[in-house]
C-alpha cells in the first residue's frame, strides 16, 4: 500500500498568506522546503521557489502561474501572479493558499523516533550481512537518515514512510473537503 500523509499533517503543510501578514522570510523558506518545494534561482516550473532580497517567488501546483510575494521587512507588501516566461504581472491578489509539493510529508518531532527504528533495523540486518556489502549498506542508510532529517523528497524515502505515525491511505481523504484543493 502507498502511504500518504494524514489529513491533519497535510493541512499543517498548507499555508494561507495575505497582504499585510507578518512572516519571517526565512520561516517561509523553511516551510516551503518542508512542504516539498525545491529552492532554485528562477521559478519557471511547478514545485519551485526562489528568494531574491525581499521577494519570494513560488510555483504551487494549484495555480496556473507562479506567485510573487514582495516583503517590506517581515510584512507582505503585495502578492501577485506573474508569467514565468516574461516575469510580467498577470494579476494582483490579496490572499493565496500554498499547498504541499509532495505527498512525502511528516512532522519534525516524528523524525527522531523513525531514525531510531531505522538504526535498530540496520543493526539487525548489518550483523547478518556479508562483510563485502557492509560499507555500502551503512553508507546508504546514513544518507537516507540525513535525507529524512532534511525533508528531502527523494523517492527512496518512501521505503521508511510507513514508520511515521501520521500516515494513512488515500481513502481517509475521501470524506474530507481538503479534496477540493486537489485536482484529480
Regions found by a protein language model. Give the residues of each.
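ASCE RecA-like P-loop NTPase motor cores
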Residues: 1-182
Amino acid at each position: 500500500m502507498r502511504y500518504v500523509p494524514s489529513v491533519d499533517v497535510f493541512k499543517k503543510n498548507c499555508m494561507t498568506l495575505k497582504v499585510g501578514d507578518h512572516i519571517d522570510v526565512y520561516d517561509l523558506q523553511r516551510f516551503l522546503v518542508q512542504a516539498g518545494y525545491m529552492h532554485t534561482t528562477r521559478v519557471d516550473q511547478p514545485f519551485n521557489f526562489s528568494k531574491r532580497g525581499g521577494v519570494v517567488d513560488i510555483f504551487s501546483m494549484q495555480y496556473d502561474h507562479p506567485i510573487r510575494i514582495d516583503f517590506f521587512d517581515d510584512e507582505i507588501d503585495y502578492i501577485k501572479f506573474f508569467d514565468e516566461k516574461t516575469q510580467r504581472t498577470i494579476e494582483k491578489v490579496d490572499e493565496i493558499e500554498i499547498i504541499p509539493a509532495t505527498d512525502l510529508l511528516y512532522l519534525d518531532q516524528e523524525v527522531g523516533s523513525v531514525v531510531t527504528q531505522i538504526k535498530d533495523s540496520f543493526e539487525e540486518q548489518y550483523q547478518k550481512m556479508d562483510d563485502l556489502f557492509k560499507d555500502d549498506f551503512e553508507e546508504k542508510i546514513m544518507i537516507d537518515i540525513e535525507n529524512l532529517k532534511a525533508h528531502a523528497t527523494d523517492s527512496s524515502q518512501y521505503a521508511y514512510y510507513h514508520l511515521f505515525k501520521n500516515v494513512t491511505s488515500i481513502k481517509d481523504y475521501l470524506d474530507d473537503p481538503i479534496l477540493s484543493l486537489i485536482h484529480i
